[in-house]
């Protein structure tokens, strides 16, 4: 594959934990309960994907690893919810931008992600960026793999975040 | 160096709540190991200048990576043709096309770094008994996909708790 893809930047996140909820019966609204607890505990969710099909609900959320002890304390008070959550520690996000809603670009990035061998746990497009969740230990290596096929401007900013905004 | 700043709003500010109607939602479930093959197929779909309005993906089930892809109605033909390709059927565990659907989205200042946005939006919809098919948040964007005719009601519900210009 030639070096034909163009992007303005690639950004990597801080270390996060992936939280999943899967409910296969009606009558429970685990997402609402989870979001309420996180909101009340002032915990940000940098990534969220939630889908419902028939009576099944499946949600995937990212929480900064430093916030996980507070999140677990908040969730412990809701036993029904707590038993339905699964945690995958040490994940991170790679954001490539802009995607310009272009399927050729997005498809090529997905193909590269698949070829890199890094697992994909989640993906979401925003107004500009395409954000993918994978193992934190593989973030830098995956970003380097992408840059073998994606041209970035010579003056693009560093991959790693230079500031850390924390909600209090 | 640590800098502490306070950003507080009585009502959370957005840059506007938008609703798009008459959209197509394709939900394609694949085995995670087939990601590169799906990417290849998606890239080929893009050669026809097909634009996607939104893509979300996550593990709907443990060994199943579900892609939710939203397109404008004018791309429906390409989408149906795409989903019927043997090469796409071969890598898919299931394909569901839902149309028409409606998409509501909004962006706001520093949404990617702030807590409580998704909770406030979800709560406002729940109070009006408005169910979504898919919800996604990343960076400063929040997206919901609804069945037909729910978009305007959802916009009204969210307009009561978020500030819009």
State where each predicted segment sits.
Chain B
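A conserved regulatory-domain signal marking ACT and ACT-like small-molecule sensing domains
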Residues: 1-165
């Amino acid at each position: 594959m030639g070096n034909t893809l163009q992007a303005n930047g690639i950004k990597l996140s801080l270390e996060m934990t992936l939280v999943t909820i899967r409910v296969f019966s009606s009558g429970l609204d685990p997402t609402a309960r989870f979001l309420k607890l996180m909101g009340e505990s002032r915990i940000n969710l940098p990534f969220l994907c939630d889908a419902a099909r028939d009576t099944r609900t499946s949600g995937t959320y990212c929480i900064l690893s430093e916030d996980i002890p507070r999140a677990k304390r908040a969730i412990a008070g809701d036993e029904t919810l707590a038993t339905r959550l699964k945690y995958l520690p040490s994940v991170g996000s790679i954001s490539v931008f802009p995607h310009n809603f272009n399927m050729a670009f997005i498809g090529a990035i997905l193909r590269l992600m698949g070829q890199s061998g890094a697992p994909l746990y989640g993906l979401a497009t925003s107004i500009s960026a395409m954000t993918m969740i994978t193992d934190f230990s593989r973030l830098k290596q995956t970003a380097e793999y992408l840059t073998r096929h994606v041209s970035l401007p010579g003056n693009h900013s560093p991959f790693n975040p230079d500031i850390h905004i924390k909600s209090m | 160096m640590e800098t502490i700043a306070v950003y507080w709003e009585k009502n959370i500010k957005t840059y506007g709540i938008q609703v798009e109607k008459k959209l197509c939602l394709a939900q394609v479930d694949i085995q995670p190991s087939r990601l590169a093959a799906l990417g290849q197929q998606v890239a080929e779909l893009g050669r026809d200048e097909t634009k996607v309005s939104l893509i979300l993906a996550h593990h709907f089930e443990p060994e199943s990576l579900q892609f939710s892809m939203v397109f404008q109605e004018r791309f429906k033909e390409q989408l149906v043709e795409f989903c019927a390709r043997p090469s796409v059927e071969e890598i898919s565990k299931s394909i569901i096309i839902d149309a028409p659907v409606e998409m509501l989205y909004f962006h706001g200042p520093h949404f990617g770094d702030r807590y409580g946005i998704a909770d406030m939006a979800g709560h406002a919809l729940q109070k009006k008994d408005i169910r979504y098919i898919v919800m996604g948040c990343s960076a400063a964007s929040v997206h919901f996909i609804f069945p037909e005719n729910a978009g305007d009601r959802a916009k009204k519900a969210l307009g009561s708790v978020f500030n819009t210009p």
